[in-house]
């Protein structure tokens, strides 16, 4: 069996680290990068890869790894699954995962593809570790502490608000599963 040809859809922080992981994986080959701007202003580190606006411009893609904002995942995944290309995403809105699973599952089955959803940190690998520890100590007390660190999803959500030029959301742990969210906003008000 040959290498798995993967396309990275989106080239922000997650896309950059996805590319780095693919480059380190001996069983994967980078099919290309899909960016809103395509090859326009192509970063130097992408010189050896096809950079396109539409995944249809790439050849023989086995899987698309969606490194897009969470709220864009369903739209991109449906378009890509309809091409018969498998998808992996890190969708992280916990309350909408069941609906996303249903929606993408139907599309994937209709086009003989597979959709792996919420395969990021939380939900994702952190959820698996938490479930494993709860199975080992079912009467124990389980806390999940996050941070300190940048909350990319919350930062993206605030940036989507009209009038916000830039935003940074930080997660600050307090302990016992409780955290604070600090949001810094740069807004340009025209006088």
Q: Which stretches of residues belong to each language-model region?
A:
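NAD(P)-binding Rossmann-fold cofactor-contacting core
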Residues: 25-44
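Conserved small/polar residues in nucleotide/adenosyl-binding loops
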Residues: 189-191
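NAD(P)-dependent dehydrogenases' Rossmann-like dinucleotide-binding region
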Residues: 121-122, 139-153, 165-172
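Anionic-ligand binding region
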Residues: 154-174, 180-184
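Glycine-rich adenosine-cofactor-binding loop
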Residues: 5-18
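Oxidoreductase and adenylate-handling cofactor-binding alpha/beta cores
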Residues: 125-141, 156-167
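Beta-loop-alpha module in the N-terminal Rossmann-like domain of NAD(P)-dependent dehydrogenases
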Residues: 53, 60-82, 94-98
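Rossmann-fold NAD(P)-binding glycine/threonine-rich loop
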Residues: 92-114
